[in-house]
Amino acid sequence: MGSIAAGAWAQADKGETSVDKTVDLNPVVVTGTGTHQRLKNTPAPVSVITANEIKRAGITDFQQAMTMMVPSLSFSPNAMGSYLMMNGLSNKYVLILINGRKVTGDISGNIDISQIDMSRVKRIEVLNGAASSLYGSDAIAGVINIITNQPKDEISFTTNSRYTRKNQFSQGLNLDIAKRKLASYTAYKYDHSDGWQNSGLTVDKNDDLIETLDQLSIGYSMNNFSQQFTYDATEKLSFYANGGYYWRMTDRPAKRDGMTGGNDYNTHYEGYNWGTGAKYRLNKRSSIQLDYVGNNYTSRYKYMLAAGDYQPGDYAFTKRQKFHDAELKGIFGFTTNSTTVFGVDYRKDILVRPDADVDKGVYTLSGYGQHEVKLWNHFTGIVGARYDYHEQAGGRFTPKVAAMYNIGNFNVRATYAAGFRAPGVDE
């Protein structure tokens, strides 16, 4: 896959107002190359949505942000939520990350985007096109990386509420505490929405109009809690640990006599996530970091009506997804004009699904490297490669070559990158 892009960058005069504009136009990004650099200096085609843009637009959820600000993304509502598409490809070929770590947990094959809390977002970086050389499986249509803020004030408490039609209500609470070397961030969010129909009528097989209970958008209630701690042991060594809990219950209409549609049960989703890591800064341009993240995502049916062996109020287990990922990554500035990245990654996916008689886990072991160099103050080049070994699908080599040439205030970019998708455990 190849692409060429050009862009113009404004240069502001000195002054407070101009500085604000410059920051908005040229933020620091990390998704395109795996290293922090200014947006105008990265050879990768990255789009950025800043926290200020999200705030000005009154955006409270991930779908709103993507729909309003990223033309290459679209969402199609269905019975189980929203179906994401990017560059014409389904969400199975889009990798969604939070601070560089994969978001897991799906509803009928669609990533459950409602578990993404927008209250802490610093910026959202969208990388168009294949990026498997850095991120591995699924990064074919593109990568969406949600970067969150870290606590800065000694004590900060914020709350926000939102109410719109269809009884859609959102309440968020955030508490930051930063004291010397230790910082804490706590967030809680509650969401609720009624279900709704375009019409209460449908056409049956005889072309007659009949009443229906089927909804275009299903009602739900959701709780999302997260906690993060950071500790700066020295100027060079830092640690972090985080965890979260996610709960969501649909609110679907029960079956009624004389009407089509309706359901015997609601669907309950519950997830736990945890992570920890450390970073050691060798110097201003070199560092080594170790990260681990785990996730346990479960779905169940909660019956409203008697069906088979189940009575109202009974739960039926349907699926559990577990995810473990450990990554060791080094970033090195061997010369003043180059940056080199090396990394190894171990990932374990586990699926328990009784209806398909699946109770299995598969691992993926990966190694990758990338070298970026700037020449003659106008040309930047990147060469990278990644090798993934999937327990069932075997090995896969993924290359990447990118270049950027500066012509005054214009950048011309060219990229060749490959992408692949390893089969899921259920596949």
Identify the function of each model-found stretch.
Residues Q11-K55, N91:
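Short, acidic, small-residue-rich periplasmic hinge/interaction motif at the N-terminus
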Residues K152-E154, R162, I177-N266:
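Periplasmic-side early beta-strands and strand-to-turn transitions of outer-membrane beta-barrels
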Residues H192-N198, G244-P253, I288-K302, N337-D349, D355-V358, E391-R396, A403-E427, ...:
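Surface-exposed extracellular loop regions of Gram-negative outer-membrane beta-barrel proteins
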Residues K179-L182, T234-S238, N283-R285, G333-N337, ...:
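Outer-membrane beta-barrel channels and translocator barrels
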